[in-house]
Design a protein with these regions (language model features):
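Basic, helix-initiating cap at the start of DNA-binding domains
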Residues: 1-22, 26-37, 51-52
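Key DNA-contact positions within bacterial/archaeal DNA-binding proteins
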Residues: 41
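Alpha-helical DNA-contacting segments of helix-turn-helix folds
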Residues: 45, 56-61
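Short, solvent-exposed alpha-helical "recognition" segments
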Residues: 50-55, 63
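Hydrophobic alpha-helical connector segments
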Residues: 63-95
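Short alpha-helical scaffolding segments that buttress acidic/His motifs in well-ordered protein cores
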Residues: 82, 94-102, 138-146
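Amphipathic alpha-helical segments used for helix-helix packing
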Residues: 86-115
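Hydrophobic/aromatic-rich alpha-helical bundle segments in the mid-to-C-terminal region
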Residues: 108-116, 124-181
């Protein structure tokens, strides 16, 4: 990897952390440049614009292509994702990106559209017993508990041990995926 490729990769890495943790509109090009320890002009040179850089960070996530999700393991897969990110530090996960950017005035619609096209629709195609409503209820619980723990920092949730948190997640997700309308 030559110097310009390394610089471009460093910009992408730092932009992803900032965009996904703080939201697109809350992050400036100067802030990205400062964090990446590069001149701000290099962002325009390599990515043309802040928006293109953001789109590149989203494109760097593989969405559902690597996820073996089916009716029998969906609860375990989603529980595992939240258990992997139990610490309270900033994180670069797709959950955090969705939470921080789906209501953004500039990129919100883009993020929602990508989530539907690259996450929801492909996963629903893999499910036979879990209905679209049940899946959406589970996602609501998934994002809700993540927000409540990480953003609102509710003491009873932030102090949970991994085994307790896992039990709660499975209980909530089972309730969502077995809901009868």
């Amino acid at each position: 990897m030559n110097k310009s490729e390394k610089t471009k990769a460093k910009i992408l890495k730092e932009a992803k952390k900032l965009f996904w943790n703080y939201g697109y509109s809350n992050v400036s090009v100067r802030q990205i440049a400062k964090t990446a320890k590069v001149d701000a002009a290099l962002i325009s040179r390599y990515y043309l614009s802040k928006l293109n850089l953001f789109k590149t960070t989203i494109g760097s996530f593989d969405w559902v292509h690597d996820f073996d999700i089916n009716d029998d393991n969906i609860i375990d897969v989603y529980t595992g994702w939240l258990l992997e990110s139990m610490d309270m530090k900033d994180e670069t996960t797709v959950v955090k990106m969705l939470i921080m950017n789906s209501s953004d005035p500039v990129v919100g619609d883009l993020v929602k559209d990508i989530n539907i096209k690259k996450m929801r629709k492909p996963i629903l195609k893999k499910l036979k017993k879990v209905s679209p409503l049940q899946y959406d209820l589970m996602i609501s619980a998934f994002i809700g508990i993540s927000q409540t723990r990480k953003t609102l920092k509710m003491p009873t949730l932030t102090s949970l041990k991994k085994a307790q948190y896992e039990k709660i997640l499975k209980h909530i997700f089972k309730g969502a995926t077995t809901f009868k309308s």
